[in-house]
């Protein structure tokens, strides 16, 4: 008899199908209220990618609206993956430094190995400039890099949604909610 694993995570086939396009999207926006399993679903997806693709996974947990703490978390995530490109870099305060950082990130992350950067609890940051930066970055990312942002609130400016076009994958509460057959 098979031993039950009480810590096993159940992800329905329908939700798995919803997650699959992340592999082909530069930016995936996961927006749903608390309790819909955003983090659980993305962590399951990333664990699958690590096992099947040997992907590089960069996780950034956002704890507050403090940009300094956010930036330190980003630097720590890169450092934990052995990527030192952001060590000593300041948070980009203007368009020129943001563009330079985008170029540097694309250069460092480009390659054959799939790379997933997951920003969790983005709603806590409450910074429109960071949202615009992420959209600009998504428009430049090499094909092997995928940005995933989970938030309780919509964070994408309408004009950026249009600019991103097919590079954007959106997952909402309708896709995450379990139905009566699941």
Indicate residue ranges for each PLM-predicted region.
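N-terminal pre-P-loop "Q-motif" helix
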Residues: 5-19
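Phosphate-binding P-loop
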Residues: 19-25
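Walker A/P-loop nucleotide-binding motif
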Residues: 26-43
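Residue-level preference for the first positions of well-ordered beta-strands
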Residues: 27-29, 55-57, 114-116, 146
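Alpha-helical sensor/transducer elements of the RecA-like P-loop NTPase core
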Residues: 40-44, 132-182
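Conserved phosphate-binding/catalytic loops and adjacent sensor/switch elements of nucleotide-binding enzymes
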Residues: 41-44, 50-114, 124-126
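Conserved Walker B catalytic segment
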Residues: 99-153
């Amino acid at each position: 008899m098979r031993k039950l694993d009480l810590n096993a995570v159940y992800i329905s086939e329908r939700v798995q199908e919803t997650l699959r396009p992340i592999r082909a999207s530069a930016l995936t926006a996961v927006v749903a209220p608390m309790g819909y399993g955003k983090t659980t679903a993305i962590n399951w997806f990333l664990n699958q990618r690590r096992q099947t693709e040997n992907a590089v996974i960069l996780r950034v947990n956002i704890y507050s609206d403090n940009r300094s703490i956010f930036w330190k978390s980003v630097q720590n995530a890169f450092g934990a993956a052995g990527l030192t490109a952001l060590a000593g870099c300041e948070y980009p305060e203007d368009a020129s430094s943001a563009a330079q950082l985008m170029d540097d990130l694309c250069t460092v992350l480009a390659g054959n190995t799939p790379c997933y950067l997951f920003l969790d609890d983005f709603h806590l940051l409450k910074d429109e400039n960071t949202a615009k930066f992420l959209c600009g970055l998504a428009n430049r990312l090499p094909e092997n890099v995928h940005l995933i942002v989970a938030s309780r609130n919509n964070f994408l400016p309408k004009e950026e949604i249009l600019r991103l076009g097919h590079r954007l994958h959106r997952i909402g509460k309708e896709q995450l909610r379990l139905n009566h057959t699941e």
